[in-house]
């Protein structure tokens, strides 16, 4: 089953025309610049905004249908909502906030949720005594305790400083693995998408510009305007293949005939991971180097060549290199290098990636 969102609405100068299908049991990220319409989209799903026309359904459960006259009120849609700010009741304890609005007592589920988010020690405290990260964990738990069919999260880390973001992120990763509830996650952070999402939809000016599996959208032309020169990268779903105990490196299998040595990753062999390789950390050679400090030298074929203009006379060339069937690596080189190597689509080359260039910030456990 899927989540179907189709509606038209005019708000201010933005004409929304949304037609979006999202998977039922995954984290789907909505990405785009501020004012693109991401929050409006989830407010329509929740019932906080009523569109002029359209249809919204979670599987067979219809929330809104303008033709049939269906418009369930917010409290009957079985949707949990986590806002940018926690919106806790200041005069209630944490436990009081968690139980507010809970219709059926379920001690086992309460224990499971509070354990998952590590907030049991906070139950007797009041919001004024909590850190920003603790407040957001309580807000997430409150949303889960309503036993929703869908969880909406509107930039839940946006108001937190970096230490608090690092505090909350592991709990969000746990959600994707342990909670069997579809999550629609609004963000403008590529790092959060890398760590959390399985599906990605890009929203711009009230329209869905592209939507699909994260790896496919990440590699598409639709992502290029959102990535700076240093952000251009390839995203891989791989598995830990082996560890090199002497040199603190881990070999990651990207495809049957393609592996990378990267800085050591904690995990057992066969652990599925997601790996980001920045395009400006990849170089190209026409012949296999015989003596080099670079640990990864991979045979490849030039798949595509594109010019990239970053403005202010900054020009670069993005080269897509095929490492194996369905496995592609982006390399960013200068126009000078392109001319000097005389690269053409179909050329056999070698991709070089430093083992130290892929660090912990580029690695995440693959969401299930």
Curated annotation (Swiss-Prot):
Keywords: ATP-binding, Cell inner membrane, Cell membrane, Membrane, Molybdenum, Nucleotide-binding, Translocase, Transport
Pfam families for the chain: ABC_tran, TOBE
Mop domain mapped to chain residues: 291-362
The protein's Enzyme Commission number: 7.3.2.5
Function: Part of the ABC transporter complex ModABC involved in molybdenum import. Responsible for energy coupling to the transport system.
PROSITE patterns the record matches: ABC_TRANSPORTER_1, ABC_TRANSPORTER_2, MODC, MOP
Lineage per the UniProt record: Bacteria, Pseudomonadati, Pseudomonadota, Gammaproteobacteria, Vibrionales
Protein location: Cell inner membrane
Protein name in UniProt: Molybdenum import ATP-binding protein ModC
Similarity annotation: Belongs to the ABC transporter superfamily. Molybdate importer (TC 3.A.1.8) family.
InterPro entries, alphabetized: AAA+_ATPase, ABC_transporter-like_ATP-bd, ABC_transporter-like_CS, Mo/tungstate-bd_C_term_dom, ModC_ABC_ATP-bd, Molybdenum_import_ModC, Mop_domain, P-loop_NTPase
Keyword Oxidoreductase set for record: no
Catalysed reaction, written as an equation: molybdate(out) + ATP + H2O = molybdate(in) + ADP + phosphate + H(+)
Oligomeric form and interacting partners: The complex is composed of two ATP-binding proteins (ModC), two transmembrane proteins (ModB) and a solute-binding protein (ModA).
Protein residues bound to ATP: 32-39
GO cellular component: plasma membrane
Sequence ranges assigned to domain ABC transporter in this UniProt record: 1-230
Protein topology in the membrane: Peripheral membrane protein
Enzyme class, UniProt record, top EC level: translocase
GO molecular function, one term: ABC-type molybdate transporter activity
């Amino acid at each position: 089953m899927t989540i179907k969102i189709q509606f038209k609405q005019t708000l201010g100068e933005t004409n929304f025309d949304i037609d979006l299908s999202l998977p039922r049991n995954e984290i789907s990220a909505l990405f785009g610049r501020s004012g693109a319409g991401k929050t409006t989209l989830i407010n329509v799903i929740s019932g906080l905004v009523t569109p002029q026309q359209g249809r919204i359904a979670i599987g067979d459960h219809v929330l809104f249908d303008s033709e049939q006259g269906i418009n369930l009120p917010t409290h009957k849609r079985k949707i949990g909502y986590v806002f940018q700010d926690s919106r806790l009741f200041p005069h209630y304890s944490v436990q009081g906030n968690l139980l507010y609005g809970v219709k059926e007592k379920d001690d086992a589920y309460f224990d499971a949720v509070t354990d998952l988010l590590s907030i049991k020690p906070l139950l007797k405290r009041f919001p004024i005594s909590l850190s920003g990260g603790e407040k957001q964990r309580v807000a997430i738990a409150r949303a889960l305790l309503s036993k929703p069919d869908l969880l909406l999260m509107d930039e839940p880390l946006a108001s937190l400083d970096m230490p608090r973001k690092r505090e909350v992120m592991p709990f969000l990763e746990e959600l994707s693995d342990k909670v069997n509830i579809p999550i629609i996650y609004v963000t403008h952070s590529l790092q959060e998408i890398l760590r959390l999402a399985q599906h990605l939809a890009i929203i711009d000016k009230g329209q869905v510009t592209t939507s699909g599996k994260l790896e496919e959208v990440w590699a598409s032309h639709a992502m290029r305007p959102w990535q700076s020169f240093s952000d251009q990268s390839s995203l891989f779903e791989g598995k830990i293949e082996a560890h090199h105990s002497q040199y603190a490196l881990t070999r990651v299998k990207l495809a049957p005939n393609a592996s990378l040595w990267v800085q050591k990753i904690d995990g057992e062999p066969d652990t599925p991971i997601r790996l980001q390789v920045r395009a400006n950390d990849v170089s190209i050679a026409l012949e296999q180097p015989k003596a080099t400090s670079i640990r990864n030298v991979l045979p490849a074929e030039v798949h595509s060549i594109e010019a990239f203009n970053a403005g202010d006379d900054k020009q670069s060339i993005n080269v897509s290199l095929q490492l194996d069937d369905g496995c592609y690596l982006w390399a960013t080189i200068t126009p000078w290098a392109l001319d000097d190597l005389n690269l053409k689509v179909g050329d056999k080359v070698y991709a070089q990636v430093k083992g130290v260039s892929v660090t912990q910030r580029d690695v995440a456990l693959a969401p299930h």
